[in-house]
Amino acid sequence: MTSFRKRTVQKPIRGTRTSPHTAQVITSSGNPYLDVVIGGGLPMGSICLIEEDRFMTHAKVLAKYFLAEGVISKQEIFLGSLDDIPAEMLRRLPRPLTDQESMEQSEVQALGDAGAENGLRIAWRYNDLPLVNSEHATAKIGHHFNLMEQMDSMMLYNVKTTLWDDSPKHLDIVIDEEFSKSSSPTTPSLEQQPVEDAPPIPGTETAPQEKMPAQEEENSANNNNNNNNNSSSVTSSTKTGSQDSPLQVFHNPRYKGLLNDIQQLLRNESFVAGTKNNLCRVCLTSLGSPLWYDEHFGEDLIKFLTLLMASVRNCNSVCLITMPMHLIAKYDASLVPKIRQLVDYAIELESFAGSERETHPAFKEYSGLLHLHKMSAINTLAVHMPETPDLAFKLRRKKFIIEKFHLPPELQESSAKPDNCISGLLSNSNATASLDF
């Protein structure tokens, strides 16, 4: 017998690939620019936190990218939110670009449209060098989307989606009525009838005068023993029932309902760790908003994130959460580092809208800054870090761009400096001429 075994190559999960740097199975976040910043994509079993800006506009765009990538890759989707309508959010997902459109877009970007707007042209020998905003040059997975157009509704029918908005689940009225009729009949059974109303068993009818006093004493003694046994059984059953009752983990029942729905979906056989059937994308938008507030808000939120991380780690899934961290910091500043400790990636979006930087000439090209607060090493020794932590983002009509933050050239100031110097020299020469002795 030979020990030869034919090597079989298993097909990877749709929309995933093995990272050449860490040998991990990663999937795209939906935005090619964000994929390169975090090392090619999100590792399987990871949680990415997007800290929302004050107006909560840019984080929702990244959430739509995340969901749209799952639809194109035919991965199962779980979307939960209290602030947004999940069904409406799915209808407004961006349309994916075709291969020809993506090639045309890359060609236009290679020509340097930013330089054409400023009236500048780059030398021909530098055309092959990477641009300033070439953070996405090494991206190999994921798709490009057009934010101006919405995705075709037929694409959503081919994907399994689970929506959660804490709305009550109404059962079918017809099924409820039939179940109530079958479970509670109108005519009571013999066991439900009282003893005095139960029909006598034929052949056992006896007159009350024929009973002997000795038999009456025995019956009374037996009844007392039965009553004692029943009372002891009732007390024991109540004790065991109190011991078997589940502990209340959350004070807010919304966390329990959301976590139960997520865990029930992740228990599916297609998401078992080690199998390569499918991947589940869990997206939670505006978690920790004022709609979640109560007396035990901080305690319940920390418990929920802890249990969520344990659930996502043990199956083929990836999670994206958007949270209004600026509101949570006002509620309790100590919650911010705790929340970042319970996620794998913590990315803050600082928008320029409504601030002085919005009108500042140095920031006119950007919509805001991107801060990397946490980058975790999942099953690896080293953490991937981008070339520079100084990143900025642009929200254009058709796409969301993340690039290296740089200041514009000081053309106007440099041209104004020689004039000032010349005028200063002339004034000094006149002053020395007037001081001639």
UniProtKB/Swiss-Prot annotation:
The keyword Nucleus applies. It is found in: Cytoplasm; Nucleus; Cytoplasm, Cytoskeleton, Spindle. The modification Phosphoserine is found at residues 183, 242. Residues 220-237 have a biased composition (Low complexity). GO terms for molecular function: phosphorylase kinase regulator activity. Pathway: tRNA modification; 5-methoxycarbonylmethyl-2-thiouridine-tRNA biosynthesis. Residues 181-192 have a biased composition (Polar residues). Its main location: cytoplasm. Residues 179-247 are annotated as: Disordered. Component of the elongator complex composed of Elp1, Elp2, Elp3, Elp4, Elp5 and Elp6. The elongator complex associates with and stabilizes microtubules; efficient interaction requires the full complex. Component of the elongator complex, which is required for multiple tRNA modifications, including mcm5U (5-methoxycarbonylmethyl uridine), mcm5s2U (5-methoxycarbonylmethyl-2-thiouridine), and ncm5U (5-carbamoylmethyl uridine). The elongator complex catalyzes the formation of carboxymethyluridine in the wobble base at position 34 in tRNAs. Binding by the elongator complex stabilizes microtubules and promotes their growth. Belongs to the ELP4 family. This is Elongator complex protein 4. It comes from Drosophila melanogaster. The gene is Elp4.
